[in-house]
């Protein structure tokens, strides 16, 4: 039962992703697209390839009318570029125009902050009974400034958000479908662990303090 609960969110994410690629989807979803525009994306096989995929494959072929979509670009910090409900080809053209305007020139790459932002914006729509497609497209090269809580460099960024993520490699970048439910599972596990520790501590018998030794009474000599 626990295994089934753990696999369910990841399986739902995979099935949504499969339907997107298969062109068989008829039910609109919420799409959160985060695009890496840092300088490392200027390298061969990165942004030019990523741009073509986002523009010609994802936006043009994998979205349907009724989809709600928000597009962000990120480097040091994420920036919202466009948010709309797709109702016509004109709306699709608006998204493509925004994607065409992205230039990979950001000095830093704070992937941790980008992931936090995805989680925050999807939380605002979590109760609308729509499936969520959370996409991060990046080379995973992390280089955050000293002002970031994720400061430092990582050749391939590691995060709890990415543990159950589905990664598809394209040339020298990755299409990553995120499972943000892992955030809630980690928090729940931490709370349960704390409760277990607290309960175990409360059941421990209180140690009895050792009895104090009485000092010998002084008896004056009668001699």
Curated annotation (Swiss-Prot):
Residues 199-223 are annotated as: Disordered. The keyword Signal applies. Residues 1-22 form the signal peptide. Residues 30-204 form the VWFA domain. The keyword Transcription does not apply. It holds the Pfam family VWA_2. Keywords: Signal. It comes from the Bacteria. Gene3D superfamilies: von Willebrand factor, type A domain. This is Uncharacterized protein TP_0750. It comes from Treponema pallidum (strain Nichols). The lineage of its organism: Bacteria, Pseudomonadati, Spirochaetota, Spirochaetia, Spirochaetales.
């Amino acid at each position: 039962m626990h295994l089934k609960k753990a696999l369910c969110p990841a399986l739902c994410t995979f099935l949504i992703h499969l339907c997107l690629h298969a062109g068989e989807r008829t039910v609109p979803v919420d799409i959160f697209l985060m695009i890496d525009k840092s300088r490392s994306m200027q390298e061969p096989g990165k942004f030019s390839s990523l741009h073509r995929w986002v523009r010609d494959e994802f936006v043009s072929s994998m979205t349907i009318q009724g989809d709600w979509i928000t597009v962000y670009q990120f480097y040091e910090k994420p920036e919202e570029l466009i948010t709309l409900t797709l109702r016509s080809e004109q709306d699709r053209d608006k998204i493509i125009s925004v994607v065409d305007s992205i230039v990979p020139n950001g000095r830093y790459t704070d992937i941790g902050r980008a992931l936090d932002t995805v989680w925050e914006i999807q939380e605002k729509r979590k109760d609308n009974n729509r499936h969520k497609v959370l996409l991060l497209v990046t080379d995973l090269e992390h280089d955050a400034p000293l002002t970031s809580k994720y400061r430092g460099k990582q050749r391939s960024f590691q995060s709890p958000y990415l543990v159950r993520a589905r990664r598809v490699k394209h040339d020298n970048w990755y299409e990553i479908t995120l499972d943000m439910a892992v955030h809630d599972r980690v928090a729940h596990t931490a709370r349960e662990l704390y409760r277990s520790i607290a309960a175990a501590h409360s059941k421990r018998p209180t140690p009895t303090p050792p009895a104090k030794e009485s000092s010998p009474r002084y008896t004056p000599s009668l001699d």
